[in-house]
Amino acid sequence: MMSRLSVFILIALVLSVIIDVLNNSKVEGACVENCRKYCQDKGARNGKCINSNCHCYY
C-alpha cells in the first residue's frame, strides 16, 4: 500500500516538472510585448512578430 502511494507521488512530481518546463519554453518563445520598439531600441529599422518570434529588420 505504501509503495503504491510513493509511486503515485513520484509520478505526480515528474509530471509537474515536465509541465513547468513546457510552460517556461512557451513563454520564452513568445514575442516581446512591443516587438517594433524592442527592435528599434536595438538599432533596427523595424520589427515584426512572426510565428511567436520577434524578427528585427536592419
From Swiss-Prot:
Q: Give its localization.
A: Secreted
Q: Entry's SUPFAM superfamilies?
A: Scorpion toxin-like
The family assignment reads:
Belongs to the short scorpion toxin superfamily. Potassium channel inhibitor family. Alpha-KTx 26 subfamily.
Q: Which domain of life is it from?
A: Eukaryota
What's the source species for this entry? Olivierus martensii
Q: Let me see what the UniProt entry remarks about domains.
A: Has the structural arrangement of an alpha-helix connected to a beta-sheet by disulfide bonds (CSalpha/beta).
This chain belongs to which protein, by name? Mesomartoxin
Listed under GO cellular component are: extracellular region
Q: What tissues has this protein been observed in? A: Expressed by the venom gland.
**Which range is the signal sequence, renumbered to this chain?**
1-29
The entry's other comment says:
Negative results: does not block the potassium channel rKv1.1/KCNA1, even at 50 uM.
Cite the entry's keywords alphabetically: Disulfide bond, Ion channel impairing toxin, Potassium channel impairing toxin, Secreted, Signal, Toxin, Voltage-gated potassium channel impairing toxin
User: GO molecular function: any one?
Assistant: potassium channel regulator activity
Residues at site: Basic residue of the functional dyad? K48
Q: List the disulfide bonds.
A: C31-C49, C35-C54, C39-C56
Physiological role: Recombinant toxin that reversibly blocks the voltage-gated potassium channels Shaker (IC(50)=0.054 nM), rKv1.2/KCNA2 (IC(50)=15.6 nM), and rKv1.3/KCNA3 (IC(50)=12.5 uM).
Q: Where is this site: Aromatic residue of the functional dyad?
A: Y57
